[in-house]
Amino acid sequence: MSEILAEHGYLADDSLATSLFLALRMGRPLLLEGEAGSGKTEVANVLSRWSGGELVRLQCYDGIDASQAVYEWDYARQLLHLRAAETTGTGTDRPAELEHSLYSEEYLVRRPLLRAIAGTADDGPVPILLIDEIDRADDEFEAYLLEILSDFTVTVPELGTFRAQRPPVVILTSNRTRDVHDALKRRCLYHWVDHPSFEREVAIVRLRVPEASEPIAREVSAVVAELRRRGLYKPPGVAETIDWAQAISVLGSSHLDERTVERTLGTVIKYREDAERVRAAGLSDLVSGALKFGT
């Protein structure tokens, strides 16, 4: 599994690769928890590229409900259909048939969960269902999601039950802004995604930013590792490391120094308070201390 992920641009450690392999073979959802920017969402993207299955993403947020996650009716089109029927007189003498026509699949808007379940009917690769940042959703939605994941069925009262012929591959992610309930965790296999080791992060930078030299990749990874040790409000993730290496390469810098860090700090530090804290501690000390570790 590690080799497959690497072929598609994702360098995973053995533990993550094994968790993913088991989830695929056992047909279980995989819950990936970890800090923002640690590469959780990219796992689903890589799976989609590898398998050829459609990536269906459900972005969770506070207040999300079934109408955003499962399905809703296209009320605007239904209203137009109704007005057209009234204008032409078509079906107005058969109200039951008119109502039935309003609640046909033609007017059903399939949201991510229903798309993933209904999309397993053909013989092609199953969809990859990414339920992103489940920790942002509320308890009620989490309970509803648990019910759907138990049997991969969705009932639309007007149309009947949609049932997955083959369950989609399900990846859930959480930044742990709150604890995911134990019931959902029991339904899933679980893996904590930590920031990569220094050498692995260097390899990731070299893979994702091939124009970055080996020294730049090592210097950037070393400084990012030091920033993570400083207790910032939002420590940089792997995504920021990649962005930083790319920015430095675009500028044509051959090595990382205080001036380059100052000019490009916004690619790796995204909060003003964190930037002020880093500057107050001294950029020169940050660079020199980190480079002793990384070179």
Regions found by a protein language model. Give the residues of each.
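C-terminal regulatory/interaction module of P-loop NTP-utilizing enzymes
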Residues: 1-295
